[in-house]
């Protein structure tokens, strides 16, 4: 595991340890909403209980910022899970190596066939996902999937296990554009309780993944905390700060945030407290106001109604026609979690147009 020279993790953990949600007042919230550019303390105020009565005002400001930087466009993409083998024992995940599920890895022929099916829906952006197993989904295998995807899609993202800089560079050379890594929780103590075995137990290596990806030449990186593992507002604060500091250090990078909540999975649950839609909305609005130019993805974990309401207000990216199992044309392996929005691409497109939004199938040209 590569170690890089970076102080971002120490800075994020220091600020997060001092984040006291109860110290903020309604005056702090209104002051933040009246600022052109927000600082870290303003972010904290928008994630505090004091901001709860101001969700409508936050929504107005968020929508203004979204319109300013993104217009009425919403980017569509879909994930493809190519393998669900995993070497980690994470208590909240269906891919947990000890979970008794049907494991599978797509062959080159399967990948080609499934990508062709996805491309036929009109989508030109794809996100390739694997379980975290270097043995069963090695860097070479991922690279082969990326090369195949390059024949069908104009933008290719990766949501795989953290890699070293040279491995990210290899995948960039294969045709990958951006990398998504969820830190899950930014509380190191809780992190160790949820991640019991495997390479994912190394908190720092995962934390530094976005920096290594950018050093490897990726044009964009995405951040996310799995809301519900820890204190959702504290994790959201840390996640936003993480993205903010990476943006300052790498000003050329395209930054985006994902907002995943815990979902049920095959053979298990987590026993952790849930995160309400109201809390999720507050976090999404705070992200948009704090980093108005960052992308924001709302996944199929959420209901169609919630997703339809949040796009245009603060979310700028939405998945469509989602399958979280292994195999599109023929199911070969079990899902990582349950989804809530099962609409296909055409249904999502029509829903966006009904709202006066512009569905965007491609916002990137490869040269």
Across the structure, where does each feature detected by a protein language model lie?
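Generic structural signal for well-ordered alpha-helices
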Residues: 78, 115, 142-146, 168, ...
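Catalytic cores of alpha/beta
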Residues: 164-173, 230-244, 303-313
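Short, charged low-complexity linear segments at domain edges
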Residues: 54-75
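Canonical Radical SAM [4Fe-4S] cluster-binding loop centered on the CxxxCxxC motif
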Residues: 68-110
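Core AdoMet radical
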Residues: 97-112, 118-213, 219-223, 229, ...
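Glycine-rich, proline-tolerant flexible connector loops at the mouths of alpha/beta enzymes
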Residues: 47, 78-80, 127-139, 264, ...
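Auxiliary Fe-S-binding modules of radical SAM enzymes
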Residues: 1-51, 248-367
